[in-house]
Amino acid sequence: MKIVPDVEPAAEVSGNFKVSVLEPSIPAVHRVENKHPLESRLKNWEAQQQQIRLDSMRRIYGLHEPVRREMEQKLASQSSRPLALGGSANFHLDILANREAVLDETDIYAAPIPLEMTYQNEMAIRYGL
C-alpha cells in the first residue's frame, strides 16, 4: 500500500557535455518545466488518498462498501445545482469525500452570477425552451 504518489520526472537530462575548457560542462536540458517537484505529487494526492480509503473500507467492511461509495459519488457528481441557488458547489461530493470541513479557493473565488439569471431563465437555456 502506497501512501504517497509516485514522482514524475520534471525534466530529462542527457549526457552531452561541452568539450571546450572555457565553456562550463553541464548536462543539456531538453525539456524544462516551471513546476516545483512536489507539484506532481500534490496533483495525484487526492486520487491516492481516495484509493487508500477505498482499500481500507474493503478490508474492514467488505467489497460492498467501496462499490456503494463509488456509486454514490458518481450519482452525486452527475447532479447539478442551479446558478440562481449559488452555483455548482457540490456538498454531497464533499461529504462523501470527507472534505466537508475543508475550505479551498473554489469556495471563496466563485464565478459571479449573472444579474439576469433566474431559475426559470437557466432552465430555459439548459433545456432549450
UniProtKB/Swiss-Prot annotation:
Gene behind this protein: ump1
Family: Belongs to the POMP/UMP1 family.
GO cellular component terms listed in the entry, alphabetical order: cytoplasm; cytosol; nucleus
Function according to Swiss-Prot or TrEMBL: Short-lived chaperone present in the precursor form of the 20S proteasome and absent in the mature complex. Required for the correct assembly and enzymatic activation of the proteasome.
Coiled-coil residue windows: none
Source superkingdom: Eukaryota
Name of the protein this chain belongs to: Probable proteasome maturation factor ump1
Gene Ontology biological process terms from the UniProt entry: proteasome assembly
Organism this protein belongs to: Schizosaccharomyces pombe (strain 972 / ATCC 24843)
Entry keywords, A to Z: Chaperone, Cytoplasm, Nucleus
Pfam families, A to Z: UMP1
Localization: Cytoplasm; Nucleus
